[in-house]
Design a protein with these regions (language model features):
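Conserved ABC ATPase signature
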Residues: 140-144, 148
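A short, proline-enriched helix->beta-strand linker immediately N-terminal to the Walker B motif
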Residues: 159-163
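Helix-to-loop junction immediately C-terminal to a conserved catalytic motif
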Residues: 54
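Catalytic Walker B motif of ABC-type/P-loop ATPase nucleotide-binding domains
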Residues: 165-168
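Conserved ABC ATPase "signature" region
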Residues: 69-70, 117-136
């Protein structure tokens, strides 16, 4: 059976900072509607990989394709419609403390959909309901837990109905209960709304709980791409060291 054409594809991507290579000949294909986790040690280029897709960082070589179109060469103005189709939830929730959650979520609706105040707020409340935060719409970020702020940030990202959502370590710093709630939301986005989710994570319960496939970055490239079950069963010593957390082995972490 022929595998469908990739929705998102990195082709032999190269990226360096200050002359230090981070990604070298990195290739990865992601299918529409799947939950793809990108894992690896600190400094291996996981967050760089997702930022390259929307042009927050530019590649040095190779190609990046999205929905049948090459996007790595797009000018800044041409990236605007791309970024409406691809949302990103940053590690920090980046909410405005002076605004209620509803006002925060309404911002992209006013800017990009030109909704008037009441209409934007009504839609914002609907988006907050999608992440189980409807009753907190009139509260301020400082009044909420980290997990609740993270869910509000996801609601804001969903406001423009993106086809893809990039998550940069969405459960970092959260307690286990809040982390699993975020996992459930990510899974619901894919299964209920058909969103393609690309998740950078170090969190084993997330990785093995909700991923369709997992890509392990190592030495600038993709060492393995597999389902969680196949990753656990891998005989590759690099894969086994990462998933078991052993300090000794072929993997090295910069600074240790």
């Amino acid at each position: 059976m022929t595998e469908p054409a990739a929705f998102i594809e990195y082709r032999a991507v190269e990226k360096a900072f200050g002359g230090q290579p981070v990604l070298r000949d990195m290739s990865l294909a992601i299918q529409r509607g799947e939950v793809m986790f990108i894992i690896g040690t600190s400094g291996v280029g996981k967050s760089v990989t997702i930022k390259l897709l929307i042009g927050l960082i530019r590649i040095d070589g190779g190609e990046i394709w999205f929905d049948g179109r090459r996007v790595d060469q797009l000018a800044e103005r041409a990236l605007v419609p791309l970024r409406k189709r691809i949302g990103m939830v940053f590690q920090a929730s980046t909410l405005f403390d002076s605004m209620t959650l509803a006002e925060n979520v309404a911002l992209p609706l006013r800017k990009h959909r030109h909704l008037a105040g009441p209409a934007a707020l009504d839609e914002a409340r609907r988006r907050l309901a999608q992440v189980y935060m409807a009753e907190h719409a009139e509260r301020y970020p400082a009044e909420l837990s980290d997990g609740m702020r993270k869910r509000a940030a996801i609601a804001r990202t969903l406001a423009l109905d993106p086809e893809v959502v990039l998550f940069d370590e969405p459960t970092t710093g959260l307690d286990p209960v809040s982390a699993r709630r975020i996992d459930r939301l990510i899974r619901e986005l894919a299964s209920g709304l058909g969103v393609t989710a690309i998740v950078v994570s170090h969190d084993p319960p997330s990785i093995f709980g909700i991923a369709d496939r997992v890509a392990l970055l190592y030495q600038g490239g993709v060492r393995a791409v597999a389902t969680p079950a196949d990753l656990r069963a891998s005989a590759d010593p690099v894969v086994q060291q990462f998933i078991t957390g052993q300090s000794s082995g072929p993997m090295e972490t910069p600074g240790f």
